[in-house]
């Protein structure tokens, strides 16, 4: 068998795509792409020397058209990504919550976080035109306090994240901290409705 390239997609407002995962349910609707490093927005050279204008970006590529469907600006970088078996959420690990540029700065905090994306809320906002068009694609602001995201603190420098075959549990593993954080995806609804706190979604954390 020979694998041939079917499509090359240019993703604006982002580079160093690290974690990448197709949507599981109800079909491969999206391909989720994590931006590991920040990029100046707009990325046309005008802000290249101004760190305050740099942003971390999460991208969803439409699996049928292979065009960028939308992007979400987040706090902190995005490492690996996965999604649920219900078609409601995607979630990504984030290290360097300090946004440091040296090893000492970027590993100083005892905790980083997992960023959870509410796909329905994002899609509704895009459909209503509640976005900025940057680089030709819809961009939403998902930084802390946004209705589109939640940030769940986890031990230092999480790396991998995977959904268990039971469709209920999500496991994020630490890279600098030898810890696995286990979430119950069924609690994410209450998290986004502000009925519980972020850490209330954690059901186990073996070290």
Annotate each predicted stretch with a short phrase.
Residues 1-207:
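Predominantly soluble domains enriched in secretory-pathway, periplasmic, or organellar proteins
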């Amino acid at each position: 068998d020979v694998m041939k390239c079917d499509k090359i997609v240019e993703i604006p407002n982002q580079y160093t795509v690290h974690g990448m995962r197709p949507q599981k349910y109800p079909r491969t609707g999206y391909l989720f792409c994590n931006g590991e490093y920040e990029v100046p927005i707009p990325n046309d050279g005008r802000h290249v020397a101004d760190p305050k204008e740099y942003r971390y970006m999460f991208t969803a590529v439409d699996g049928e058209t292979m065009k960028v469907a939308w992007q979400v600006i987040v706090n902190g970088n995005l490492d690996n990504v996965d999604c649920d078996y219900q078609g409601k959420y995607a979630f990504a690990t984030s290290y360097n919550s300090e946004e440091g540029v040296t090893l000492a700065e970027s590993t100083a905090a005892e905790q980083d976080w997992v960023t959870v994306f509410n796909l329905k809320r994002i899609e509704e906002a895009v459909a209503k035109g509640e976005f900025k068009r940057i680089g030709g694609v819809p961009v939403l602001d998902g930084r802390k306090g946004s209705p589109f995201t939640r940030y769940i603190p986890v031990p230092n420098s999480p790396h991998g994240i995977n959904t268990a075959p039971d469709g209920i549990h999500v496991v994020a593993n630490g890279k600098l901290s030898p810890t696995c954080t286990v979430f119950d995806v069924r609690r994410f609804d209450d998290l986004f409705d502000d009925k519980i706190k972020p850490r209330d979604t954690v059901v186990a954390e073996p070290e």
